[in-house]
Amino acid sequence: MIYLTQRLDHAHPITASVTLPIDLRVKSRARVALNDGREAGLMLPRGLLLRGGDLLTTDDGSEVIEVIAAPESVSVVRCADPFLLARACYHLGNRHVPLQIMPGELRYHHDHVLDDMLRQFGLEVTFASLPFEPEAGAYTSDAHSHSHSHAHSH
């Protein structure tokens, strides 16, 4: 088994790739199958969020593995009105929904209840199978490390 222990911050020749959904790209420890069929173990620093295009390597640098963000079942909201998109972000964020935010577009894991809520705001929501790259705050180790004992309303 290949042990991937660090993320590279600059280009290297790629020896293999691994396609991972977001649920595995947020784990520091996991057993995964490379796209060529070999087994690999993720042994990464805690709190590291892997993105599509990231490069991982072994301690000795003998392997350089490219991370590919797997297509996932997502709801897609497209809208030219920044106010409506901001309103959607507010309501989804208030529910702690991991959210990918792009100019004129939002993505979140498909959820028909959330879809219906946003449609009531006048937004068009579609379903797709696309890579999901949420904002880091939804998944990094410090995103919810604060105590909820302080006063704020949800």
Label the predicted regions.
Residues D81-F127, P131:
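Conserved, well-structured core segments that form or line functional sites
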Residues I65-C79:
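Short glycine-/aliphatic-rich beta-strand segments at the starts of folded cytosolic domains
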Residues L42, T57-T58:
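A generic structural signal for residues embedded in beta-strands
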Residues R29-A33, E63-A69, A88-L99:
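Short, flexible, solvent-exposed loop/turn segments with mixed acidic/basic and small polar residues
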Residues V32, V76-V77, L106-H109:
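Generic recognition of long tandem-repeat/solenoid scaffolds
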Residues M1-P13, D36, H109, V113-H154:
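Helix-rich terminal scaffold detector
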Residues M1-L49:
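Intrinsically disordered, low-complexity, positively charged segments
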